[in-house]
């Protein structure tokens, strides 16, 4: 969009004006990942104006407490913040700064803004889920601060161990929602990335192998498996699930220059 934002969807039958802050900034992560793989500086240069504008939009949603409003709709900020979304933004801002440094471009993100976000994620739980039901039942809220580098290793291990048994089903994978008998490939693969970041390689390999049990005869991953009913559900095999699995496999097997992407 002209203000640097990305709409939450582009294929809806209804008119959509919802612009999520973490969606807009996440282009930084994709661009830096691409650069680590291909060292294509021209590609970065071409996308710099788009990236810079996207980050400008996201930064406009940061509150005085350090967190980011989760979205803007019809020109107004929606008054709540997501732990997973803000963790994603944290990683995006770091990638943006790396790109700016590589291209010798002016950097609109101050370290103070990043530190403020990090401090909020670590010490101000009251800033998240202020006006809706807590998202803590979702596994992404558990492992994303680890995956995105918000927590140091000691705190990451503490966080990991505290809720491991709530979300991880032995021999199957990671649940998407704590109380549901449903393991999902994308969440399992992302948790592999978090484990790899902490150098918990054996645990990561075991979880990745369990994730691959969701592969069908065509070599594609089902979204998830309802172990209570012994059924794959939903009946879909989305590209983003496969992308998460490829990233997870790369973090363990080191088959591309970006294999340590989540270890910075």
Model-derived regions, located:
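Short linear capping/connector segments at secondary-structure termini
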Residues: 7-14, 69-77, 175-176, 225-230
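Short, polar/charged, Gly/Pro-enriched helix-capping and turn/loop motifs at alpha-helix termini
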Residues: 41, 65, 103, 218-221, ...
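Aromatic-rich carbohydrate-recognition surfaces in CAZymes
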Residues: 1-62, 86, 208, 235-253
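CBM-like carbohydrate-recognition segments
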Residues: 5-7, 153-160, 177-187, 193-197, ...
């Amino acid at each position: 969009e002209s203000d640097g934002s990305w709409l939450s969807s582009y294929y809806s039958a209804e008119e959509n004006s919802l612009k999520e802050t973490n969606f807009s900034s996440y282009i930084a992560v994709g661009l830096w990942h691409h650069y680590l793989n291909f060292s294509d500086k021209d590609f970065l240069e071409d996308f710099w104006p788009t990236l810079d504008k996207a980050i400008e939009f996201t930064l406009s949603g940061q509150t005085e407490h350090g967190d980011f409003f989760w979205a803007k709709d019809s020109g107004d900020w929606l008054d709540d913040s997501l732990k997973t979304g803000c963790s994603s933004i944290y990683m995006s801002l770091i990638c943006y700064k790396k790109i700016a440094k590589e291209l010798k471009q002016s950097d609109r993100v101050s370290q103070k803004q990043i530190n403020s976000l990090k401090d909020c994620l670590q010490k101000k739980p009251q800033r998240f889920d202020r006006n809706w039901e807590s998202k803590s039942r979702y596994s992404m809220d558990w492992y994303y601060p680890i995956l995105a580098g918000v927590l140091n290793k000691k705190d990451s291990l503490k966080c990991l161990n505290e809720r491991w048994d709530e979300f991880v089903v032995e021999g199957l994978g990671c649940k998407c929602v704590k109380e549901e008998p449903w393991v999902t490939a994308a969440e399992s693969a992302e948790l592999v990335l978090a484990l790899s970041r902490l150098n918990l390689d054996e645990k990561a390999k075991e979880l990745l192998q369990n994730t691959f049990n969701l592969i069908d005869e065509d070599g594609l991953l089902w979204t998830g498996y309802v172990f209570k009913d012994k059924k794959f559900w939903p009946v879909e095999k989305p590209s983003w699930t496969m992308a998460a699995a490829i990233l997870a496999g790369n973090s363990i097997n080191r088959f591309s220059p970006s294999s340590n992407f989540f270890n910075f």
